[in-house]
Amino acid sequence: MIIAIDGPAASGKGTLAKRLAAHYGLRHLDTGVIYRAVGMGMLALGAELTDEARAAAVAAALDPKTFDDPALKSQAVGEAASVVSALPKVRAALVDFQRRFADTPPGAVLDGRDIGTVICPQAEVKIFVVADPVVRARRRTLEAQSRGEPADEAVILADILKRDERDRSRAAAPLKQADDAHLLDNSHLDVESGLRAAIDIVEAVRAGRLR
């Protein structure tokens, strides 16, 4: 079984995907981490983030061992990831990796921006997670503070709105809800309530009550 979870930054889709994978005994891939790793690599090189050829080379040479680096969660790396993920050659370099992961039995839960529309359009279950931008900014602020990083909630909100616009308007795989994806508004759900809502969707699809 392949479960595709898409949505904007800080919507809670990553936590939801990880918990959903554990519930069903599936592997989990946070595809945003892959793009963050490319962004971090470009920052380390001091390269222009819009240098498509260099970014594609970084993507092709990614080491999965770096996916657990805490530095990937920084605001600067997140912004860099949003820029490089809009580059068609970067996306092309990473598509095969993601599809191989998803197609390996017994299946997987993948979360990102274009899982249900581009990476795994054949996924049995597709969920599109949304949350109010103000709520998302608050979550990001608390996450940064928990890591001991300075965080200005107003600045983070502005960055989130800017990223949303960039993700939705990019030419390559823009952020959008797949026609057959089920909407889950995570604005006011805690982790357990969000997981329960997602499980209800999965079970309804498997039972034929939802399509």
UniProtKB/Swiss-Prot annotation:
One GO CC annotation: cytoplasm
Keyword Oxidoreductase belongs to the record: no
Gene3D superfamilies associated with the record: P-loop containing nucleotide triphosphate hydrolases (3.40.50.300)
Residues passing through the membrane, by range: none
One Gene Ontology biological process: pyrimidine nucleotide metabolic process
Keywords noted in UniProt: ATP-binding, Cytoplasm, Kinase, Nucleotide-binding, Transferase
Class of this enzyme: transferase
Protein location: Cytoplasm
SUPFAM superfamilies xref list: P-loop containing nucleoside triphosphate hydrolases (SSF52540)
Binding site for ATP: 7-15
GO MF, any single term: dCMP kinase activity
EC number, UniProt record: 2.7.4.25
InterPro entries referenced in this protein's UniProt entry, alphabetically: Cytidylate_kin, Cytidylate_kinase_dom, P-loop_NTPase
Catalytic activity: CMP + ATP = CDP + ADP; dCMP + ATP = dCDP + ADP
Main location: cytoplasm
Family: Belongs to the cytidylate kinase family. Type 1 subfamily.
Name recorded for this polypeptide: Cytidylate kinase
Organism, scientific name: Rhodopseudomonas palustris (strain BisA53)
Underlying gene: cmk
